[in-house]
From Swiss-Prot:
Free-text function comment from the UniProt entry: Involved in mRNA degradation. Catalyzes the phosphorolysis of single-stranded polyribonucleotides processively in the 3'- to 5'-direction.
Domain S1 motif per the UniProt entry, residue ranges: 621-689
Subcellular location: Cytoplasm
GO CC term (a single one): cytosol
The family this protein is said to belong to: Belongs to the polyribonucleotide nucleotidyltransferase family.
Residues covered by the KH domain: 552-611
Pfam families documented for this protein: KH_1, PNPase, RNase_PH, RNase_PH_C, S1
Protein name: Polyribonucleotide nucleotidyltransferase
SMART domains in UniProt: KH, S1
Subunit structure: Component of the RNA degradosome, which is a multiprotein complex involved in RNA processing and mRNA degradation.
Length: 699
């Protein structure tokens, strides 16, 4: 075994790429390290494509092994299970920039598996996973237009920081990941603290400039370790068939794409395609209908793109910078804590907000350590939203990714735990979809949070931008339709406030996207965002003054930290009885903070009263109402506070001489007592007759 190793400095860290020792039966295997964070990336591709396949079956699997962090998995089976949300998101992060680098017409199955085998808690594994994937594909021999570079960019004290550590990220106003080739940015994923557009654009350019060292190093690594390139050639176009398809369908498709209603347009497109295929079959029964479908799709794309480049109206009749008609409603559901219905053209999101206690927060145990997430946002995309049937169940990768994007857009304006001590779960149900449903979720979430009384800093809106570029001519599109997303060259999603950007996601399918184009897209997105915010603010301009009557109200009190054990009780008996008998949820913190949650105000008051009783100190000279709990020859023990008993000596029961305690007192009898003394050992001496004397004097 002769390892081939390439090391280079990248920001604050040393990156090492190694091949030739591990997983030698894969087409390529690279052990990639950044500091002590190490991933094994393997690539396997099938040499032959399945006959008739018209898509590229690329699979990216990213898996974090708990042994990488020196942990044993939880659960009964004590082994890793289905991918976590973090693993799914990183798999998508890797997939998105590499997919457009495979050549058109390449339909061989390719699988990339990234396994995290060692992790430094200060160095997240996503960037080195992207670098390792790029290196493995580069040396595999599989057709791939790499190398690809990747960088994380932070923004701390007005300065960009390359690949910040986890500690540095906690103080950063920006967390941006950018990936690209030597000459082009292909993918951006970020969240930010409402930063100006120029800062966001600068971070993309900075990250792309800095990652050139990665691209150069992988090229050198490939020169030394690369396998022979596959003998693959792109399929040759059947020019005669292309001409026939164009003649039969071009005019019909152009007319169909003047229909503005999505379902009607799709129906007419299907009619045109069916007629073309029928005519081709009549002329040649041996014609390959799969090839015809591919050519019809290409023609469809050409027709739509040509109209846009020529300056003609878009599919639904809009100008490039126009936003579709908006409908904004808040408080649409009676029993939810907050709700909104946001409609933009043929895209609609029904968004709900639910408030819970700290106990309802999401607890995440990953290889990077444990963390608690008080704000959750879940995105659902049922098949009926696009007029289809399909499976309903666990969220798919796309749903997880869109939910996280919307979460990033909103997180910057969420209140702190001190400002709003609730856990918050938002669910966005996409009830109609024709493009930009994740950005509709951002808008709907902002509205639902305000309706629920969550004191977010300001409204947030999102917009999806697109691009059509032919040579030096290009058109930037605002609020793209699903078809424009599919047929265009860029999907550029921007969420933010009036003051700046909170989330940015960009996927570019072509090279040649310049800084100028990105700048135009950001400025056009700003105008669209402000327009949407103006409409949203007409529906609900600020958060409600109070939370819903159906939401739990959290009341916070402070107790002596030394009294926490008294509130909990032996084996949790006291706090369990408190919650069951009052119907409240009670949470205790080590500093003595007690949070009582209930939608019933009287129940909260009762819980507070009982906690104050439990934690209060016995005061000498004070009168208490107590209950006799034990009778002895020399007196009776009386409970005056939860967990606090005192002795009424036989001489303190009455002014008269008492021969037998049982003649005057019985078990569970309620009596009024005065505290006479608390000795150094905490023993309490009580008197019934002194209490009676004091009461008589008061009368």
């Amino acid at each position: 075994m002769n390892p081939i190793v390439k090391s280079f400095e990248y920001g604050q860290h040393t990156v090492t790429l190694e091949t030739g020792v591990i997983a030698r039966q894969a087409d390529a295997a690279v052990l990639a390290s950044m500091g002590d964070t190490t991933v094994l990336v393997t690539v396997v591709g099938k040499k032959e494509a399945e006959a008739g396949r018209d898509f590229f079956p690329l699979t990216v699997n990213y898996q974090e092994k708990t042994y990488a962090a020196g942990k044993i998995p939880g659960g009964f089976f004590k082994r890793e299970g289905r991918p976590s949300e973090d693993e799914t998101l990183i798999a998508r992060l890797i997939d998105r920039p590499i997919r457009p680098l495979f050549p058109n017409g390449f339909t061989n199955e390719v699988q990339v598996i990234i396994t995290v085998v060692s992790v430094d808690p200060q160095i997240e594994p996503d960037i080195i996973s992207m670098i390792g994937t790029s290196a493995a594909l580069a040396i595999s021999g599989i057709p791939f237009s790499g190398p690809l570079g990747a960088a994380r960019v932070g923004y701390i004290n007005g300065e960009y920081v390359l690949n910040p550590t986890v500690t540095q990220l906690a103080n950063s106003q920006l967390n941006l990941v950018v990936a690209g080739t030597e000459g082009a940015v292909l993918m951006v994923e970020s969240e930010a603290q409402a930063l100006p557009e120029e800062v966001m654009l600068g971070s993309v350019v900075y990250g792309h400039d800095q990652q050139q060292v990665v691209i150069k190093a992988i090229a050198e690594f490939k020169a030394e370790a690369g396998k022979p390139a596959w003998n693959w050639t792109a399929p040759v176009a059947n020019e005669a068939l292309v001409a026939q398809v164009k003649e039969l369908a071009e005019v019909g498709l152009a007319q169909a794409y003047q229909i503005q209603v999505k379902q009607e347009r799709y129906a007419q497109v299907a009619v045109v395609k069916a007629a073309a295929k029928e005519a081709l079959l009549a002329a040649n029964p041996e014609v390959d209908l799969r090839e015809v479908d591919g050519l019809l799709g290409s023609l469809e794309k050409k027709v739509v793109r040509g109209r846009i480049i020529r300056g003609e109206p878009r599919i639904d009749g809009r100008e490039p910078d126009m936003v579709r008609a908006l409908s904004v409603l808040a408080g649409v559901l009676p029993r939810t804590h907050g709700s909104a219905l946001f409609t933009r053209g043929e895209t609609q999101a029904l968004v709900t907000c639910t408030l819970g206690t700290e106990r309802d927060a999401q607890k995440i145990d990953s290889i990077m350590g444990e963390r608690t997430n008080r704000f959750m946002l879940h995105y659902n995309f049922p098949p009926y939203s696009v007029g289809e049937t399909g499976m309903v169940g666990s969220p798919k990768r796309r749903e997880i990714g869109h939910g996280k994007l919307a979460w990033r857009g909103i997180n910057a304006v969420m209140p702190s735990a001190e400002e709003f001590p609730y856990s918050v779960r938002v669910v966005s149900e996409i009830t109609e979809s024709n493009g930009s449903s994740s950005m509709a979720s951002v808008c709907g979430t902002s509205l639902a949070l305000m309706d629920a009384g969550v004191p977010i800093k300001t409204s947030v809106a999102g917009i999806a931008m697109g691009l059509v570029k032919e040579g030096d001519n290009f058109v930037v599109l605002s609020d793209i339709l699903g078809d424009e997303d599919h047929l265009g060259d860029m999907d550029f999603k921007v969420a933010g406030t009036r003051d700046g950007v909170t989330a940015l996601q960009m996927d570019i399918k072509i090279e040649g996207i310049t800084k100028e184009i990105m700048e135009i897209a950001l400025q056009q997105a700003y105008g669209a965002r402000v327009h949407i915010l103006n409409v949203m603010d007409q529906a609900i301009g600020s958060h409600r003054d109070d939370i819903s009557d159906h939401a739990p109200r959290i009341t916070t009190i402070k107790i002596n930290p030394e009294k926490i054990r008294d509130v909990i009780g032996k084996g949790g008996a006291v706090i369990r009885a408190l919650t069951e008998e009052t119907g409240t949820t009670i949470e205790l913190e080590d500093d003595g903070t007690v949070k009582i949650a209930s939608s019933n105000g009287e129940a909260t008051k009762e819980a507070i009263r009982r906690i104050e009783e439990i934690t209060s100190e016995v005061e000498v000279g004070r009168i208490y109402n107590g209950k006799v709990i034990r009778i002895v020859d020399f007196g009776a023990f009386v409970n005056i506070l939860p967990g606090k008993d005192g002795l009424v000596h036989i001489s303190q029961i009455s002014d008269e001489r008492v021969a037998n305690v049982s003649d005057h007192l019985e078990l569970n009898q309620e009596v009024t007592v005065k505290v006479m003394e608390v000795d150094r050992q905490g023993r309490v001496r009580l008197s019934i007759k002194e209490a009676q004397t004091k009461e008589a004097a008061a009368e």
